[in-house]
Every structure is written in structure tokens, then in C-alpha cells.
Amino acid sequence: MHSDATLHILTQFKTYQQTTEYTCGAASSLMVLNWFGQAQYHENAVATLLETHCTKGSSVENIADLFDLIGWNVEYHASEHPKFQTVEEAEQAIIRYIDRGIPIMVDWVDWAGHWQVLIGIDTCGTDNPYDDVLIFADPYDVTDHKQDGYYTFPLGRFFGMWREGPCAEKENPYRQPFVVAHPK
């Protein structure tokens, strides 16, 4: 699959399946490391560096800190307030990152809190972002009878569900948590 006028995608993004129920953040980080050619890392080591907790998983801050520690450019959002006020703003930001070859790690309410890597968006040739389809590298791809690590979801629905899940155990969970990291 390659980008075209409506499809923006990281071609040949390799997926990875997490080995525990709680290391989706580590597995997502590992996929981003691998995307940029950093294949020396392993899921368990990354989980340790992220201080991954067996019920809470990995935090936005710890994932951002890991990439900062290895000297990468890092942008992240960890706030009770949304970064993007409209679905259109989110759509344009996603397109900008993907078109630059940069995946976006997102944490959302799927599975009561789950990290995935956003690797593509199809605008379906319309100006309406509510018909856009997001393409994820999902480290816990167990729902479509084809465990290839790829998952699609409508942007409009995702935008409304883009917040930390109950497993974060916060009274005021982050809204639109994400980490973008790439080598300097």
C-alpha cells in the first residue's frame, strides 16, 4: 500500500505483537524504534525502561522520556485538556506527521486503555473528516481474525474516544494523549 491523493500511509511499517496483557506502550515504542532502524531494542527491556506497570501500563511521560533519553526529537501531549479542538485540526496534524514519515503513538480508551501506533489515514476523497479512516499498527490485534497487527477505525469515532482509559486510574484522565518521536 502506498500513499496517493487520499491515502497517507507509512508504507511497509512492520508490526509487532505484545507478549503480555500490559505492554502495549512498550510494544508501540518498539515499533517506532524499529521503523527508524533501531532494531537493537527488545520489548521487555523497553517495558523496564518505561517503568511499565502490570495494571496501569505505560505513561505518556515515560514513553516521551525514553525517546528523549536516546536523543530523539519528541513531542507529546499529556493533559486533561485536548490538544486539538476540532476533528479537522486532528486530521491535519495526522496528515502532516504521516506525510513526513513519522508515526504517532496514541493512547485511547480501547481495551480500557491501549497504546497503538497511528501509521495512516484515508480521507476517502472528501472534505468531511467524519468519513476518514485511520490505520493503526496494533500491538494487540486479536479482533479481526487476522493477527497481522493492522487495525482500522473511523477518525470521527476515534476523536470522541481519544482519552486515557480506566486502567490509568486517574480521576481526570488525559485527553488526546500521544507521543511523536523521531531521530534528530
Model regions and ranges:
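Short flexible/disordered coil segments
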Residues: 70, 76-79, 106-116, 142-152
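Active-site-adjacent substructure of cysteine-protease-like catalytic cores
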Residues: 81-138
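Cysteine-nucleophile protease catalytic domains, especially the papain-like/related folds used
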Residues: 2-84, 165-184
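N-terminal start-of-chain detector that recognizes signal peptides
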Residues: 3-5, 77-79, 87-93, 149-153
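Residues that form generic nucleotide/phosphate-binding pockets
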Residues: 49, 66, 93, 97, ...
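Noncatalytic regulatory segments and standalone regulatory/sensor domains
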Residues: 1-2, 52-54, 121-184
